[in-house]
Amino acid sequence: MLRIGSHVSMSGKHMLLAASQEAVSYGANTFMIYTGAPQNTRRKKIEDLNIEAGRAHMQENGIDEIIVHAPYIINIGNTTNPSTFELGVDFLRSEIERTAAIGAKQIVLHPGAHVGAGAEAGIKKIIEGLNEVIDPNQNVQIALETMAGKGSECGRSFEELAQIIEGVTHNEQLSVCFDTCHTHDAGYNIVEDFDGVLNEFDKIIGIDRIKVLHINDSKNVKGARKDRHENIGFGEIGFDALQYVVHHEQLKDIPKILETPYVGEDKKNKKPPYRFEIEMLKEKQFDDTLLEKILQQ
């Protein structure tokens, strides 16, 4: 079954219910949320997330699997500032609790940035952090995201992710979130040889680790190490390559999440592209008038 959705907002008083309603309005059967603003630690209590009503709405609409994304402020790769590392460890622990309470099985995490100490030192610190965070009995896997390699990001190569996974004691609690834009920007040829890239991933990490896919086009050429998402079919990856990933036999049951940009020049009135992009990917047919249609909604 094709599981496809997008990032949606969990906010206001309806919280999880609002997120599910937004996803359904896009024709989605899965979705991804942050449990609060990704750039700060302010969070509502678990009992204020409106979980029961949200889960009921999900069930009514055939949504059985959702994803949580950890906030960007978590950086367990930071070797220079102990307080940043400790905040990351503590906050990731509490986010895992919230993820479990919501009923999600995967929390996507940017592995971390070494902030100048070098990739080896950063990876060592990430392993230390994950070993501190992980409870072997937790019901949530941490999905390490494939990164573009912007700045001092760790996890831009499959080898770096494998190194992290191998260093973690209870690595059965680790999975991978494969991001098409990041992988392309890191230098992998997913446009012309996605099967080759997937085979390489399988040899180095194991395809069974992939539990989430982020489906994004890229504003940049392969290997640019920039990480700037583009709407589906309007970037350097292109529609054909992305729809090949979405419908790939080896990835068919994995949730595919769009994180493409809102459309429009007016910053206060940008339009979400997800209903249109999801439909286009389901139909396997590129629509070059898509951006105009998004603006007219």
From Swiss-Prot:
Reaction(s) the record says it catalyses: Endonucleolytic cleavage to 5'-phosphooligonucleotide end-products
Binding annotation for Zn(2+) 2: E145, D179, H214, E259
UniProt: Zn(2+) 1 binding residues: H69, H110, E145
Record SUPFAM superfamilies: Xylose isomerase-like (SSF51658)
Protein's GO biological process: base-excision repair
Cofactor(s) in the UniProt record: Zn(2+)
Residues engaged in binding Zn(2+) 3: H182, D227, H229
One MF term in the entry's GO annotations: phosphoric diester hydrolase activity
Protein keywords: DNA damage, DNA repair, Endonuclease, Hydrolase, Metal-binding, Nuclease, Zinc
Keyword Flavoprotein: no
Full protein name: Probable endonuclease 4
Gene name tied to this protein: nfo
